[in-house]
Amino acid sequence: MFGSSRGGVRGGQDQFSWEDVKTDKQRENYLGNSLMAPVGRWQKGRDLTWYAKGRANSAGLSREQELAAVRQAEQEALMAALGYKNVKKQPTGLSKEDFVEVCKREGGDPEKGVDRLLGLGSSSGSVGRVALSREDKEAAKLGLSVFTHHRVESSRPGTSLALAKKKLRSEEKVEPGPESHRKSRKEKKKKRHKKEKRKKEKDRGRRLDSSLAPAPIQHDSDSSTCCKKRRHDSD
């Protein structure tokens, strides 16, 4: 009367079979039912435990091989660091001819002394070259990315030259070299010399003016006394 409402066997292992689970209503509640009690058509005639076979032996061998390879690499690196072994250089995949062509493409003009690089989307027929500033050159040497796209106005042909000249002037102003320092010193010396000359000329002019100016009239004391006596006599 007070029996369990659930079906199935709750006894030992000898009373349980997966064949009974296939027809059970609660089949999906059994753990591992998809492998031990398969029902679908795609599961018939297939090895459902293929991923777990031949794994124990291969795992040990691969682990040992991996450790041996790591030890060998560490030993080679140590020997190369101590100088007992030459470091193997990896091939770049470029032949001498290809290297010469790349150098010709990326070479700068000898007149302007500016390095040039190929822009993105350029081909061998129409090569788009962009002038690099000194800061961009230093960044390229360090391996940093360089922005090579610049705005171009096709309607005015002379604008590109004007922009390039402005950039060169701004670079020269920002990064003055030893020649510019010398020029500025010379200009300062010239200005000082001119100021000193002007001061000397002004001093000379003042001295000449003071020497040429008429002396003030000085009345003698005798003449003044005589005039006073005459006035007294007339009175």
Curated annotation (Swiss-Prot):
InterPro entries: MMTA2_N, MMTAG2-like. The modification Phosphoserine is found at S122, S126. Disulfide bonds: none annotated. Residues 1-11 have a biased composition (Gly residues). This is Multiple myeloma tumor-associated protein 2 homolog. Residues 1-21, 106-129, 147-235 are annotated as: Disordered. Keywords: Isopeptide bond, Phosphoprotein, Ubl conjugation. The keyword Ubl conjugation applies.
